[in-house]
Amino acid sequence: MRFRCYLIFSIFSDSLLGAGFFQGGKRAMVVSTPIAAEEKPPIQANVVETWEISKIYRTGFWMNQKVESLKPLSIAVQQGETFGLLGPNGAGKTTLLKILLGVIRASGGRGTLLGKPIGDRQTKQRVGYLPENAYFYDFLTAWEFLDYIGSLFQIGKQERQRRILAMCDLVGLAQKTAKKKQLRQYSKGMLQRVGMAQALINDPEVVFLDEPMSGLDPLGRYQVREIILSLKEQGKTIFFNSHILADVEQICDRIAILARGELLCSGSLAEVLGNDEGYEVVLKGGEEEALGKYLANLSQEQDVWHGHYQGDVQALVDALPSLNARLISMNLARPSLEDYFIRQLRERGITTSQ
């Protein structure tokens, strides 16, 4: 029994215990008082904030070679925000997450998490974390595993049972399966659901998710999106890495793009992609001179015209008969996040992952 407990404890040292999540004892009770009419509420500090934070690894036989995994980087994530960190493999996304969680130390710069310096033990009681590659003890059931994680957070037995049941419902894990089936028999997608449940069992204020969609089928991805949106409705802050840009575009309030350890851009989707200004129009028929009065950047491929239109859509549709043209398609001109992401990498000559 001692040997098994030691195994469980050491297996999760990187993803959970190494981050110090279970240090610091019980939570203190917070008593809120109403704000007087003449008083102004305090300004809400950013949940996550970094100032020129960086990470350099030393390699080689004599440890005399340096690899700059993360160049000086400054970001801020606000209360209740869903923040997506994007980048190709080797961009430094997981490195940044581990620095924020206190799993590894930064080489330079500083940062805060929930208003406290990175690494504060009491703060880690208020944080949830799903690693990209979580290590599970094969011979435990999901219920036993979640019960163990809850006990590390010093959650009482009855409350643990209630939360485990709620987490299984939330992530779509059948109660019978959770109690009877050992984790070694789970598929990758099912293990990801268990990992999501353990990240939320302590009812965290901020949740860090490293590739939460990894290994999930379309239904599983939909369920994870719904979980993230429900957490957002509860006022929780979500910080996650993902390669699935379509999901990021649906979920995130703000994003940042990393490549080779460098921050390329950050901001809201409207700031990064631009507002919906105009339409990309495809027409068939008509004359160039007449169409040019309506469409900018007009070009022709075979007998089809492509151009950019700004103005009232109905006005263009009404003018088509007089132009002797037929509308083939009309789409908002704003690029997709995937198009923007690829363009940012190509502009910097980045064609492969590092």
Swiss-Prot record:
A Pfam family recorded for this sequence: ABC_tran
Stored InterPro entries: AAA+_ATPase, ABC_transporter-like_ATP-bd, ABC_transporter-like_CS, ABC_Transporter_VariousFunc, P-loop_NTPase
Binding site for ATP: 87-94
A GO molecular-function annotation: ATP hydrolysis activity
CDD domains: ABC_DR_subfamily_A (cd03230)
Keywords for this protein: ATP-binding, Nucleotide-binding, Transport
Stretches assigned to the ABC transporter domain: 48-285
Family, as annotated: Belongs to the ABC transporter superfamily.
Protein name: Uncharacterized ABC transporter ATP-binding protein sll0415
UniProt source species: Synechocystis sp. (strain ATCC 27184 / PCC 6803 / Kazusa)
